[in-house]
Amino acid sequence: MQTKLSVNINKIATIRNARGGNTPNVELSAIDCERFGAHGITIHPRPDERHITTKDTYDLARVVQTELNIEGYPDQRFMDMVAEIKPAQATLVPDPPHVLTSNAGWDTEKHIVELTKLIAEIKRHGVRTSIFVDTELKNIEFAAKTGVDRIELYTGPYAEHFPINKEEAIAPYVKAAELARELGMEVNAGHDLSLENLAFFKKHIPFLAEVSIGHALISDALYFGLENTVQMYLKELV
């Protein structure tokens, strides 16, 4: 199956915010990513607006023609945005506002009641749901109990161990993904996926629904250009 590429454009907003003004233009970047072949756009509008702002979120909702994936900690601000914008997908991540980047998945057993309520609320708006989790099988099992449509596997540990031992790095992800599929959930993945490790990941999880890639893709675009880079990542997912 064709795994979809959702380009995370947080880093483009980070560059813009470092200088002020509107260069690079976040909306145009999203439109261009789609034009170059991306299947979706991912954003993480944090409360401190360090990269994607609330205004960006609403502006992007008006221009994105593929799938808009809004990820974030499900506080009231986030839930209100999801209810108003109704993106294609909402991905719940457990990081509080002060965390630099998402670095862990949900303890779904501990937060089962809260997550179940949140997932039900989001689904009422016709939005596909996803929960950010690690590969601990218990967290996959309890994610399924929430009624969520998909899980997003946190691939930071995979990327870290890939240069050391590829087979050991991928093994827990294969088990987690297969369990998720058995329990009726589709599987997304994201965090530190790159041109170096993406094809190997897809090869071992061929039913992977979607990857969300930002930091590595935008960094590669500095050298290869955005259009070439999007195409390079798409080829890794064939």
Which residue ranges define each predicted feature?
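Catalytic cores of alpha/beta
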Residues: Q76-I85, E136-T146, A189, L193-L208
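Glycine-enriched alpha-helix->loop->beta-strand junction motifs that scaffold or abut catalytic
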Residues: G37-H39, V63-Q65, E84-A90, R124, ...
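Glycine-rich phosphate-binding active-site loops on the catalytic face of alpha/beta enzymes
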Residues: H44, L92-V99, R150-F162, F207-L226
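Histidine/lysine/aspartate-rich catalytic loop segments that bind and position anionic ligands
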Residues: R128-A180
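Hydrophobic faces of well-ordered beta-strands that scaffold small-molecule active sites
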Residues: T3-I9, I41-I43, L68-I70, A90-L92, ...
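Alpha-helix-loop-beta-strand connector modules within alpha/beta enzyme cores
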Residues: R50-Q76, K110-S130, K166-A189, L195, ...
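Conserved N-terminal beta1-alpha1 strand-loop-helix module at the mouth
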Residues: M1-E71, D75-R77, M81-P87, F142-K145, ...
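C-terminal helical cap(s) of enzyme catalytic domains, especially alpha/beta-barrels
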Residues: A61, A104, N165-K166, D220-V238
